[in-house]
């Protein structure tokens, strides 16, 4: 028991959130069959989009993640399902005066012929914060997967840029138990972060990957989905379409990212544009 005057160790985790979601097909439609929610992670009622995809929002009602916080998200998209997962707001990574890491683990399993897409809101690391994320997606035969994440250099409107202590992210995608994509990012701001050829004058960054299962019909078109300045895209050795971009402002990045996302989804998945309600 902690009493007044008893110091609380800054090194221990302050919160551990867990979210488990299982989707399946019921009466010919994708449905959320099971959910386990441990605060501060939770979901709101699913929405069905006009295209038939089931959309779910992940919510963290707190003011952000703190050093020592840990969250785990596990999603099972059963055979033939169509699932879209979004987050309600930006992930605000609070300062960590004691040097503790805020960590997040995500594991997606996409069943035979299913499609799972994850497009979270922006990650916003505050000055002095430390954030580490690991995301893994395992795809069954003919499964499709899409991911697009964005990162800000800090609280730009307050004049705070590249002041965080450390940011690390690893994304891996496996199809038929073979790794088709691996992306490791490690940002530790330093005196040369703003140098030409590194970040230049840009404050917003994006990275994405899309995998189309067994079908390669749309890959040539999807390999170069955008000609927007500050963006690059290509095809991994395993057949995954990847993209990465930078922009000076958030709206500019988001506009280009939406265009790219819909172009890749059309070319690779043959999917209709997403009509999102927030």
From Swiss-Prot:
Signal sequence interval, chain numbering: none
Protein name, entry field: Urease accessory protein UreD
GO cellular component: cytoplasm
InterPro entries in UniProt: UreD
GO MF annotation list: nickel cation binding
Family indicated by similarity: Belongs to the UreD family.
Compartmental location: Cytoplasm
This protein's UniProt keywords: Chaperone, Cytoplasm, Nickel insertion
Protein purpose: Required for maturation of urease via the functional incorporation of the urease nickel metallocenter.
Subunit structure: UreD, UreF and UreG form a complex that acts as a GTP-hydrolysis-dependent molecular chaperone, activating the urease apoprotein by helping to assemble the nickel containing metallocenter of UreC. The UreE protein probably delivers the nickel.
Protein's UniProt keywords contain Iron: no
Keyword Chaperone: yes
